[in-house]
Design a protein with these regions (language model features):
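Short, surface-exposed, charged amphipathic helix/loop patches that serve as local interaction elements
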Residues: 1-83
Length: 83
């Protein structure tokens, strides 16, 4: 599933990320990465990292509305359903 960012992310190399492809299937590694997060904020960032394939640094630079939207779109797939 593709998601168009509200605010594009500027990468260190000067390029921009404007669209993110959200995974619709997760692995045990993904569950572990999210489960090992320290709190609600960390777990939301971890979810967006595994769902998007972006680096944590890229996700930390995202607009909060985009982080929240991607997490909300990915969560149903993570728990076994569809959005």
């Amino acid at each position: 599933m593709d998601y168009k960012l509200i605010v594009p992310v500027n990468k260190v190399d000067g390029s921009k990320i404007e669209t993110v492809t959200i995974k619709e299937s997760f692995t045990g590694r993904d569950i572990k990465a999210i489960g090992n997060a320290k709190g609600d904020g960390d777990s939301m960032i971890a979810l967006v990292v595994v769902a998007s394939g972006l680096t944590e640094n890229n996700v930390l630079g995202m607009d909060a509305r985009d982080v929240r939207a991607i997490a909300d779109l990915a969560r149903p797939f993570l728990i076994g359903g569809e959005g």
